[in-house]
C-alpha cells in the first residue's frame, strides 16, 4: 500500500519525463548517439550559415568587379574620344585660320599648284608598236647550234 501511495504521488510528474525516441533506437541499424546527433545538427547549421555568407561575399565581389570594369570602359572611351581629331568638346578644340580657302577654293587651277613637268613622256595605246626616236644598237643574238 505504501508503494501504491508513492506511485500515485509521483504520477503527476510523469508528464515532465522525456519521451522515448523511437526513431533512434540503439538496437536498430543506423543508431546515432544523441550527442553526435546534436553535433552533426550544429555543424550542418554552421555550414548553411557559412554558405550564405560566402554567397553574399561572392555577390558583393562580382558587383565590385562589374563596377570596376564599367569604370575602365568609361575612362577608356573618354580617352579615345579626347584623342580623336573631331572631338565633341568644342571648348577644348583649337581653331586654325583658313586664309586661302584651302581645297574648297575653286578660283585656282589645280595643275598650276604643282608647277612640275612630267618626267616621262605621255603614253597612249599602241605607242609600244612604234619605233622609238633614238636608234637601238644592233646586238647579234647568240645562236645555239648542234
UniProtKB/Swiss-Prot annotation:
**Bias category Polar residues: which stretches?**
77-118
Superkingdom of the source species: Bacteria
Tell me yes or no: is Glycoprotein among this UniProt entry's keywords.
Answer: no
* Compositionally biased region (Low complexity): 32-54
Q: Say yes or no: keyword Signal present.
A: yes
Give the residue ranges for region: Disordered: 27-54, 70-146
What is this protein's record name? Answer: Uncharacterized protein YhhA
Q: What is the source species?
A: Escherichia coli (strain K12)
Instruction: Identify the coding gene.
Output: yhhA
